[in-house]
């Protein structure tokens, strides 16, 4: 299972995985109520539209697909990428759909027409992560190489800021207080001031006993609804809970994040976990079938 999303408008959780399926789970009954068919290969990411009953999925078949959440109808196939679409994000304003691909490009899409309006080619390597800050009309993207985190202005896709995280960035998350988190394939983690692009803290994953040194990668991340707790999923079958103190508005300075909890997951999660935080609930998935 590669992706999770929890609806803010319905009691539904959506999951997507290497089996080319998207499943809709009723959180009140813990049962699958809908399945969405159409991808030709594994699905790597999914995102829910914040105001419409629309689901967007992306995967290894180099496409993103737009679904009617209720009827399971495939509305659009968003083609044009030349490689795996590794990340997707939806927002209320235009562009309502943003995709990042292994072909090192980002595409901004007109949701109503199902067509690409802008292709951003500033990244030199695969774009694996996207993040939408809740406090402003911009987005961030992450890849590998120098200046591998970029901040863009919507709707045009104008480049605003370059940030650097040494390593292959797998995940980005941003909270309403302007803290941007990035996690990389080598286990390194950084916190940035989103407005300025200045890093103010670095951390590193230490692999758990019984895991290989190569299993230090950070695969996914999500802030809780308060924006003060960050959950990360790692390749060594564990999750981090990181306390990111709120920024002081008067001094515009961030306090240092503090690791306050770590949990070792069951042994079947051999490839890492994905996390989504809703209130006090935590969902995580791995390379197993759950």
Identify what each model region corresponds to:
Residues 9, 16-19, 27, 51, ...:
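Conserved strand-to-loop turn within each blade of WD40 beta-propeller repeats
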Residues 166-168, 175-179, 187-188, 195-290:
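Terminal intrinsically disordered, low-complexity extensions flanking WD-repeat/beta-propeller proteins
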Residues 12, 21, 32, 40, ...:
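A conserved positional marker within WD40/Gbeta-like beta-propeller blades
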Residues 84-89, 93-185:
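Eukaryotic tandem repeat interaction scaffolds
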Residues 31-34, 73-76, 115-118, 158-161, ...:
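A structural motif specific to WD40 beta-propellers
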Residues 1, 37-43, 79-85, 121-127, ...:
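WD40/WD-repeat beta-propeller blade N-cap
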Residues 4, 22-25, 46, 64-68, ...:
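WD40-repeat beta-propellers
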Residues 9-11, 51-53, 93-95, 135-137, ...:
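Short coil/turn segments that connect the beta-strands within blades of beta-propeller domains
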């Amino acid at each position: 299972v590669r992706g999770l999303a929890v609806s803010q408008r319905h009691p539904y959780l959506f999951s997507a995985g290497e089996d080319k399926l998207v499943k809709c789970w009723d959180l009140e009954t813990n049962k699958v109520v809908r399945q969405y068919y159409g991808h030709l290969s594994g699905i790597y990411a999914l995102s829910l539209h914040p105001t419409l009953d629309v689901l967007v999925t992306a995967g290894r078949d180099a496409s993103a697909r737009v679904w009617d959440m209720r009827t399971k109808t495939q509305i659009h196939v968003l083609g044009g990428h030349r490689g795996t679409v590794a990340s997707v994000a939806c927002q209320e304003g235009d562009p309502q759909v943003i995709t990042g691909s292994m072909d090192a490009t980002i595409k901004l899409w007109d949701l109503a027409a199902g067509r690409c309006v802008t292709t951003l080619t500033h990244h030199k390597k695969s774009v694996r992560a996207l993040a939408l800050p809740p406090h402003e009309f911009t987005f961030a993207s992450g890849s590998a190489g120098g200046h591998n985190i970029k901040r863009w202005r919507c709707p045009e896709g104008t480049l605003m800021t370059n940030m650097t995280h040494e390593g292959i960035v797998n995940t980005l998350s941003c909270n309403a207080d302007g803290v941007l988190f990035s996690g990389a394939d080598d286990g390194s983690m950084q916190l940035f001031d989103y407005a300025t692009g200045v890093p103010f803290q670095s951390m590193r994953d230490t692999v758990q006993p019984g895991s290989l040194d190569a299993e230090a990668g950070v695969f996914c991340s999500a802030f809780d609804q308060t924006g003060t707790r960050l959950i990360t999923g790692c390749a060594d079958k564990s999750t981090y809970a990181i306390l990111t103190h709120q920024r002081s508005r008067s001094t515009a300075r961030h306090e240092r994040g503090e690791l306050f909890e770590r949990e070792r997951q069951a042994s079947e999660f051999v490839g890492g976990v994905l996390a989504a935080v809703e209130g006090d609930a935590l969902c995580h998935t791995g390379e197993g079938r759950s």
